[in-house]
Swiss-Prot record:
PROSITE patterns: ADPK
Lineage: Eukaryota, Metazoa, Chordata, Craniata, Vertebrata
Keyword Cell cycle: no
Name listed for the protein in its UniProt record: ADP-dependent glucokinase
A Pfam family per the record: ADP_PFK_GK
Signal peptide start-end: 1-22
């Protein structure tokens, strides 16, 4: 009988605790566990949760990613837009009758042989690259083979159009896109993207995206990572023909954020035209009303003189924010003799401390300060396994959420999933790293439960987070644009800007 009473007593108390939980769901778990333990019922069962580092990191991101208080309402994006024809690089080279040879980089492609050598060069590194193809007829022939190839897919292309598409996925945002928009591209664009009539043209600009998977082979070559090689004969985007249309459209559209891209497309132009056009870019940006932040999205470049001009000819001081990857960051510091500029290429995963040093140098040398009339206060850096957001203190808010959101979308978009599928991604970021190599940096040990790491250096804040890398990416093109758009979407600029 006593045994029965004890069992019943325990049962009633367990039921009571359950009722408390149902009636007071907001009561902290620790309080409930203490209550359970005080009743001598043994340790409370641990709440279910993700066990893998990837699962814990994804759950931590979801808790951190919140919308900013002040949100963008109208975003204007320009000026490069095209149709991406996406297919297997190896299969296209085979269809063109090309055989595996030796890799060699070419800053401009003049022939099919140049294409094959450049593709092999970057496939061997697992690195993304973009090149201009100079011969119109040869490019047209290659583009026709690619476009009609079984399995070839047509997508919205061009940094501006891709960023516009990403923003347009948010129904509460109005998006203006200025760029060379032909019939196929117009058909592919989201209904929420408004294209001014002056941007419409009769013929599309095509870019060929040659993808390869991690471990894919071509002759003796084996790709270490999945990536893509992009090339085009794009004259409209190359001359940034839509720049003036873009700026003239802003007065009527009244955006509260402007995103500019396409400077890299000028590499196929003469030096004189590049110089002239850059000056016009600066003038156009200067015509954008004060108080509207301007984000510049960089892309793959090989012309050091053009990159140096972008840095020094008042383009950087005229923009508010930059988006770039590891190739562009290294090329930038090499072109402008910045930190670690003697490094010829990244050896595997870009060193966090080196990246941090270069970001610090850009903002210190070209960013806003008391002694410099520059608007540049933010850089969003992304590489395959981690991202860093660097900001000048006092100008931006919600950057912890912004960097996490950018990293999260890298995993979902590459895997073509709505949310992170932890079985299809892996955590490949360095488990520990130094925050600087040019000064006494801190040693950071990665914790998946606290995935965003923050550090500060002379009035500049850094937010670092790993990426959950998709093991079997469906599509790699446009990831950088999606990352930058998502980071901007969750960013908040202070009102005094």
């Amino acid at each position: 009988m006593a045994l029965w009473r004890g069992s019943a007593y325990a049962g009633f108390l367990a039921l009571a605790v359950g009722c408390v939980f149902l009636l007071e769901p907001e009561l902290p778990g620790s309080a409930l566990r203490s209550l359970w333990s005080s009743l001598c019922l043994g340790p409370a069962p641990a709440p279910p949760g993700p066990v893998s580092p990837e699962g814990r990191l994804a759950a931590a991101w979801d808790a951190l990613i919140v919308r900013p208080v002040r949100r963008w309402r109208r975003v204007a994006v320009g000026v490069n837009a095209c149709v991406d024809v996406v297919l297997s690089g190896v299969k296209l080279l085979q269809a063109l009758g090309l055989s595996p040879g030796n890799g060699k980089d070419h800053s401009i492609l003049h022939s099919r042989n140049d294409l094959e050598e450049a593709f092999i060069h970057f496939m061997g590194k697992g690195a993304a690259a973009e090149r201009f193809f100079s011969d119109k007829e040869t490019f047209h022939d290659i583009a026709q083979v690619a476009s009609e190839f079984p399995g070839a897919q047509h997508y919205v292309g061009g940094n501006a159009a891709l960023i516009g598409q990403k923003f347009a996925a948010n129904s509460d945002l109005k998006v203006l896109l200025c760029g060379p928009v032909g019939p196929k591209l117009h058909e592919l664009l989201d209904d929420n993207v408004f294209v001014p009539p002056e941007s419409l043209q009769e013929v599309d600009e095509f870019h060929l995206i040659l993808e390869y998977q991690a471990g894919e082979e071509w002759g003796q070559l084996k790709a270490p990572h999945a990536n893509r090689f992009i090339f085009s004969h794009d004259l409209s985007n190359g001359a940034m023909n839509m720049l003036e249309v873009f700026v003239s459209s802003l007065e009527e559209f009244q955006p509260d954020l402007v995103v500019l891209s396409g400077l890299h497309m000028m590499e196929g132009q003469s030096k004189e035209l590049q110089r002239k056009r850059l000056l016009e870019v600066v003038t156009s940006i200067s015509d954008i009303p004060t108080g509207i932040p301007v984000h510049l999205e960089l892309a793959s470049m090989t012309n050091r003189e053009l990159m140096s001009s972008i840095v020094h000819q008042q383009v950087f001081p005229a923009v508010t924010s930059l988006g770039l990857n590891e190739q562009e960051l290294l090329f930038l510091t090499q072109s402008a003799s910045g930190p670690h500029s003697s490094l010829s290429s990244w050896n595997g995963v870009p060193d966090v401390g080196m990246v941090s040093d270069i970001l610090f140098w850009i903002l210190k040398e070209h960013g806003r300060s008391k002694s410099r009339a520059s608007d540049l206060t933010r850089i969003h850096f992304h590489t395959l396994v981690y991202h860093i957001l660097a900001t000048v203190d006092g100008h931006w808010a919600n950057q912890l959420a912004a960097v996490a959101a950018g990293a999260r979308v890298a995993g979902t978009q590459a895997c073509a999933t709505e949310t992170i599928d932890t079985s299809r991604v892996s955590l490949r970021a360095p488990q520990e790293f130094m925050t600087s190599h040019s000064e006494a940096g801190s040693r950071i040990v990665l914790n998946p439960n606290k995935p965003v790491v923050e550090w500060h250096r002379e009035g500049i804040s850094f937010h670092f987070t790993p990426v959950l890398v998709c093991k079997d990416p469906i599509r790699t093109v446009g990831l950088g644009d999606a990352i930058s758009a998502e980071g901007l979407f969750y960013s908040e600029v202070h009102p005094h800007y």
